[in-house]
Amino acid sequence: MTPIAPTDDYPDNFVLDDEIMEEIRYYESEYRCGRRVYSLIKATTKDEIHTKDKCRIFYVNNIALTWMIRKYYLPIIRFLQMFPTLSECAVGVNSESQEWQQLDAFMKRHPNLIGGDYSKYDQKIPAQLILAGFKILTLLARRCNYSEEDIFVMETLAADVAYAYVMFNGDL
């Protein structure tokens, strides 16, 4: 990354280097052709103090895959986050806020609800469930007039995420 002149809106302004932009263009061209990129996802331990028996893991994408996910899915996810009672999605809602209380009251009016936050979900979640989540976002993208080409990219990208190759301590 190369720093560039800051602005009021972007005080830490930068541009991505040509090598990174070329990788992003490669990912996009492969996805547009319906070919997976098989990007490696790195699993790494969190830098936290825990008991000897507990070690928390998180997953890291490279910047090209992150760029693609954010380009195609972030506008829809942002919309869902902005309207938690409409989307019934509490990601990003402060649990000590009035918005949380409104969401709680709304959800309790209905007899069926799912608590989607459960222990070790990122280690146990099946690919089919990941793909189902992406499918919902893709259906919303269709309703938002995404092009068929963009939908195709999103579906191929979803497969790369759902069936990811994860590298942990150098092992795949």
Show the residue positions of the predicted features:
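Viral RNA-dependent RNA polymerase
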Residues: 1-172
